[in-house]
């Protein structure tokens, strides 16, 4: 039971008239009137009792004279709903200070204006007007003061603004303001960051400034921007400190929900995490933004929304904010292999498309098509998969034709350009092109390595995936030749890595004895482009000490080391059943083999595989030349200098067992993808499939071994030591770990999972 605490003291109301109260009186006027116990939560620094906080009413101690207006406050609230503009006086504002914050329990009592949704992309929305809505309520004075004191000094802020190079535009405006308005009025420059909020303003507005400053710092580097070398603390330290404080006190504080600015703060947090490489944290923040937006009703395009605006100068469009939230969510879901948060597709209605710009229309169509790809990946049956894929492909073609052919030329980025606005929009166009080609890769990747009795059946998907990968990589080189700051345009690094891997695997798959290689003439130019991408990633790591760039460059370097040869040698992509993972995440492998540890997935083994005589015999009999094959096996962990092997007891034959009599006891695991246990094995010799997944019902093993999750590997071995099982789990990063602990963030897992999609999910 919480001990009662005195209601707001006389310090809170320095000019108020005090009255004498009986000894032991602690309750406020509102609790006394309601005959309720007045309790303060000791865990919360607040001048309001629990009851007043829940009701959203002023909490005034009985030692102060009660104003009759407070008693009738509830009735006045109801009347204000019907008023076109509520009447507010300075005394009213002071007494109603606690109402400036919407909490889930005070929705009914807050005097909102209910607003019809906009049918024009340029319309501004305003809610209940308040002369001092941006002023901090009394219960948040300490928080506002604390946040203000955490801001960098004005001298540091001025240096940060002067350090702007090609990042001289505040991109966070894209989250709230439509393109046509930004084209017409221009984007804000860093000088707007010099408008530092006063210590008495609402804490959400101070946090918004902190997050804007942090996201701007992401695009700067001390070695490239000399002005920030003399800051009172390192730019990265300032950036991290500002974000940590804003997240801890504002974006995760349910008491501060309800305003457009608070939603914008959560959106900026999600964008910040994505740029820093923390895709999983970005996804979590994005889902929080989606939930808040739904509570506000922003998803209800043809209905009513409810929210408030703290600062009348805030520019925003609620439907655009909803579009940005949903787009980022679907983009991250594709990268991470996660289900989408909502299936809303109203953003591509005829009305929305007609009111937007060319690039805005493309992005709206991309948002809807991402939803369809995610839906296909999640629910499509064997018969539907190919049909849905073809439909989405045609829609992407239609979306591309909505812009002129000249628009699709890769823009030439030049920091020397005097017009920074033009440079910004050229970069934005380049990114939109990359995202378009990434959708093509995501759409056709499951078919890229498949073969069929009809050899040309999947050629379209393979060639589309190859060409889209080239388009992504060429634009990535253009971007990173100019912008080598790791925290700028971060998601493009993940997309480029997937494109490079897809292109390399496509070339590997084409090097088969006796088969015509349709990519032979492009191999050297493609290889040179991937080498340039690898060099760019290496340089970014040298400049930024960036884990993602370092590991991506290392992986591509190893893949490039695999020689592409014809003859009787084929290239295999499988997962090593006995791979040994050291503490640094590398594996011990023979020459010519690349092994990648994928957390929660296994060890991917990529290398040349020379078939045995028996293998060649089976291959010739069943299907001709074997293409790439993929297996997935669990990871074994080495926590000390001695290797520890995981051996899985096989109760069904692996591809090696089928093709070679010299290894009759090759271990084989059971896997669980989408909660369906099956064995993934290379059976390239079988007709109509390069990857065959043999389903096995291992009920006994399922009872004895818990799955790590819906998409995680399950080891099928009753002798698997529980201590080693625990060690294996302990060595995985946390599910929402940052990029320093989990560089690839699970993007590699989603990539290989897409390639290894089972026949039950793919059309034949």
Curated annotation (Swiss-Prot):
Main location, first listed in the record: nucleus
Locations listed in the record: Nucleus
Record-linked SMART domains: Fungal_trans
Region (Disordered): 73-94, 112-136, 633-672
DNA-binding positions: 28-59
Matching InterPro entries: Transcription_factor_dom_fun (IPR007219), Zn2-C6_fun-type_DNA-bd_sf (IPR036864), Zn2Cys6_DnaBD (IPR001138)
Keywords from the named record: DNA-binding, Metal-binding, Nucleus, Transcription, Transcription regulation, Zinc
Signal sequence interval, chain numbering: none
Tree of life domain: Eukaryota
Gene Ontology molecular function, alphabetical: DNA binding; DNA-binding transcription factor activity, RNA polymerase II-specific; zinc ion binding
Compositionally biased intervals (Polar residues): 77-88, 663-672
One GO-annotated biological process of the protein: DNA-templated transcription
A GO cellular component entry from the record: nucleus
PANTHER family membership: ZN(II)2CYS6 TRANSCRIPTION FACTOR (EUROFUNG) (PTHR47840:SF1), ZN(II)2CYS6 TRANSCRIPTION FACTOR (EUROFUNG)-RELATED (PTHR47840)
Physiological role: Transcription factor involved in regulation of the dehydrocurvularin biosynthesis gene cluster.
Name of the protein described by the UniProt record: Dehydrocurvularin biosynthesis regulator
Organism from which the protein derives: Alternaria cinerariae
């Amino acid at each position: 039971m919480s001990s009662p605490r005195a209601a707001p003291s006389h310090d809170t109301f320095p000019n108020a008239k005090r009255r004498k109260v009986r000894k032991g009186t602690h309750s406020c006027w509102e609790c006394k009137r309601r005959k309720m116990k007045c309790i303060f939560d000791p865990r919360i620094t607040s001048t309001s009792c629990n009851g007043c906080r829940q009701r959203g009413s002023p909490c005034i101690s009985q030692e102060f004279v009660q104003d009759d207006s407070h008693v009738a406050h509830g009735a006045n609230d109801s009347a204000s709903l019907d008023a076109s503009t509520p009447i507010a006086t300075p005394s009213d504002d002071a007494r109603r200070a606690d109402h400036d914050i919407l909490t889930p329990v005070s929705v009914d009592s807050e005097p909102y204006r209910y607003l019809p949704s906009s049918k024009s992309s340029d319309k501004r929305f305003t809610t209940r007007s308040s002369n001092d809505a941006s002023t901090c309520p009394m219960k948040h004075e300490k928080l506002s003061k604390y946040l203000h004191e955490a801001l960098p000094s004005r001298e540091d802020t001025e240096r940060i603004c002067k350090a702007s190079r090609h990042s001289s535009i505040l991109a966070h405006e894209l989250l709230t303001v439509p393109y046509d308005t930004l084209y017409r009025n221009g984007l804000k420059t860093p000088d707007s960051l010099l408008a530092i909020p006063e210590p008495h303003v609402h804490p959400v507005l101070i946090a918004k400034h902190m997050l804007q400053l942090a996201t701007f710092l992401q695009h700067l580097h001390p070695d490239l921007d000399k002005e920030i070398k003399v800051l009172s603390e390192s730019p990265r330290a300032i950036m991290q400190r500002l974000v940590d404080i804003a997240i801890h006190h504002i974006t995760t504080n349910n008491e501060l929900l309800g305003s457009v600015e608070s939603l914008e703060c959560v959106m900026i947090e999600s964008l910040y995490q994505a740029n820093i490489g923390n895709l999983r944290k970005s996804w979590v923040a994005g889902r929080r933004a989606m939930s808040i937006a739904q509570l506000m009703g922003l998803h209800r395009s043809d209905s009513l929304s409810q929210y408030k605006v703290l600062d009348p100068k805030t520019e925003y469009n609620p439907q655009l904010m909803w579009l940005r939230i949903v787009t980022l969510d679907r983009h991250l879901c594709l990268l991470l292999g996660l289900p989408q948060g909502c299936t809303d597709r109203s953003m591509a209605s005829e009305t929305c498309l007609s009111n937007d710009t060319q690039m805005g229309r493309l992005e709206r169509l991309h948002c809807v098509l991402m939803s369809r790809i995610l839906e296909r990946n999640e629910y499509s049956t064997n018969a539907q998969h190919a049909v849905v894929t073809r439909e989405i492909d045609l829609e992407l073609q239609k979306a591309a034709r909505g812009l002129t052919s000249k628009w699709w030329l890769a823009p030439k980025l030049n920091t020397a350009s005097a017009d920074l606005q033009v440079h910004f929009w050229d970069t934005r166009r380049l990114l939109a092109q990359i995202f378009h080609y990434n959708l093509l890769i995501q759409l056709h990747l499951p078919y890229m390595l498949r073969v069929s009795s009809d050899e040309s059946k999947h050629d379209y998907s393979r060639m589309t995936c190859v060409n889209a990968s080239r388009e992504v990589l060429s634009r990535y080189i253009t971007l990173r030749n100019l912008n080598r700051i790791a925290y700028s345009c971060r998601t493009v690094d993940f997309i480029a890595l997937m494109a490079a891997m897809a292109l390399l695997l496509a070339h590997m798959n084409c090097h088969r004895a006796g088969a015509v290689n349709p990519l032979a003439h492009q191999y050297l130019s493609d290889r040179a482009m991937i080498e340039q991408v690898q060099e760019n990633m290496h340089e970014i790591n040298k400049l930024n000490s960036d884990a993602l760039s370092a590991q991506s460059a290392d992986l591509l370097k190893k893949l490039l080391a695999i020689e592409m040869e014809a003859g009787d040698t084929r290239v295999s992509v499988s997962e090593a059943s006995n791979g040994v993972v050291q503490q640094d995440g590398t594996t011990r492998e023979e020459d010519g083999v690349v092994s990648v540890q994928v957390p929660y997935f296994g060890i991917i083994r990529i290398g040349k595989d020379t078939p045995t005589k028996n293998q060649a015999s089976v291959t010739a009999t069943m299907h001709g030349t074997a293409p790439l094959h993929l297996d997935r096996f669990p990871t074994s962990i080495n926590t000390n200098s001695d290797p520890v092997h995981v051996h899985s007891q096989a109760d069904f034959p692996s591809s090696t067992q089928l093709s070679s009599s010299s290894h009759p006891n090759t271990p084989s695991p059971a896997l669980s993808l989408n909660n369906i246990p099956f064995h993934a094995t290379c059976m390239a010799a079988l007709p109509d499939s390069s990857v065959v997944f043999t389903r096995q019902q291992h009920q006994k093993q399922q009872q004895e071994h818990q799955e790590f999750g819906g998409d995680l590997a399950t080891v099928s071995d009753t002798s698997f030591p529980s201590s080693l099982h625990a060690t294996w789990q302990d060595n995985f990063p946390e599910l929402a770990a940052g990029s320093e602990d989990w560089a690839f963030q699970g993007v590699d897992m989603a990539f290989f999972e897409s390639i290894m999609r089972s026949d039950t999910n793919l059309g034949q």
